[in-house]
Design a protein with these regions (language model features):
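Glycine-rich adenosine-cofactor-binding loop
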Residues: 2-21
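Short active-site oxyanion
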Residues: 3-4, 35-37, 72-75, 189
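Short hydrophobic segments within beta-strands
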Residues: 6-7, 40, 78
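Short alpha-helical
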Residues: 11-12, 83-84, 114, 198
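Short amphipathic alpha-helical segments
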Residues: 17-19, 51-52, 87-91, 133, ...
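NAD(P)-binding Rossmann-fold cofactor-contacting core
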Residues: 23-50
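Phosphate-bearing ligand-interacting subdomains
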Residues: 44-108
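Structural signal for interior beta-strand "rungs" in well-ordered beta-sheet cores
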Residues: 101-217
């Protein structure tokens, strides 16, 4: 069994708890069980605290509390924003804490994949073969990742998005709900792909791409 804290008290934090709970229900080996010690958030809202308490989870404190008191040595980032994920993970890693990932048992994960620490894959997601998911990549419900694709660290793929085969998505990029990235394309660092956009050509770093076909300011 591994003691963990979930960092973040918002909506994706509770979705992450769903994934952890589903994982625990089916894991066979006791050492694979994830024991959630509590939630870490610097500024949780009252409504989010109440929503977590209704599920018997408590907000323990902020990042300073986690670093000083170490209720667990492993953390799961239940945060959707790629940039915020990066900031928090880099701080916690410097302090010697360890990233923990989790994959929902109802996700479909193919062969020969590389899955680095901190990856979260939600229910209904489909990950094809020879896919690389770098640190703290999040694949939300019903998203699809095609063969031979590489999602770089801190990328978030929102619900229902489709990333086709042979695609590279750069660090800290957000792919919006229902967006489609066509085969063989390159998406740079720190991009935002808008909801329902269809990406038909390479996207330079730092761009926000919206529409069908997706366009961005030059």
């Amino acid at each position: 069994m591994t003691d963990v804290v979930v960092v973040g008290a918002g909506g994706f934090s509770r979705e992450t708890l769903d994934v952890i709970e589903a994982h625990n229900r089916v894991c066979i080996r006791p050492e694979d069980h994830l024991n959630v010690m509590g939630i870490i958030d610097d500024n949780p809202s009252t409504i989010n605290i109440d929503r977590l308490r209704s599920r018997h989870y408590e907000v323990l404190g902020g990042l300073d509390f986690l670093i000083a008191n170490r209720p667990a040595e492993a953390y799961v980032l239940g945060i959707g924003s790629p940039r915020v994920k990066k900031q928090i993970a880099e701080r916690l890693d410097r302090e010697g804490l360890h990233a923990q990932g989790v994959i929902h048992p109802q996700a479909v994960v193919g062969s020969d994949n590389i899955v680095e620490p901190g990856v979260i894959v939600c229910s209904g997601a489909q990950i094809s073969t020879n896919v690389q998911l770098d640190r703290h990549v999040h694949v939300n419900p019903n998203a699809t990742i095609g063969h031979d694709t590489h999602l770089a660290e801190f990328t978030s793929i929102n619900p229902g998005a489709i990333v086709s085969g042979e695609v590279y998505v750069g660090p800290t990029t957000l792919v919006g709900a229902g967006a489609v990235i066509l085969q063989g394309l390159f998406v740079g660092t720190g991009c935002t792909i808008g909801a329902n956009a269809c990406v038909t050509k390479d996207v330079p770093s730092g761009k926000t791409a919206v529409g069908i076909p997706a366009r961005w300011a030059t």
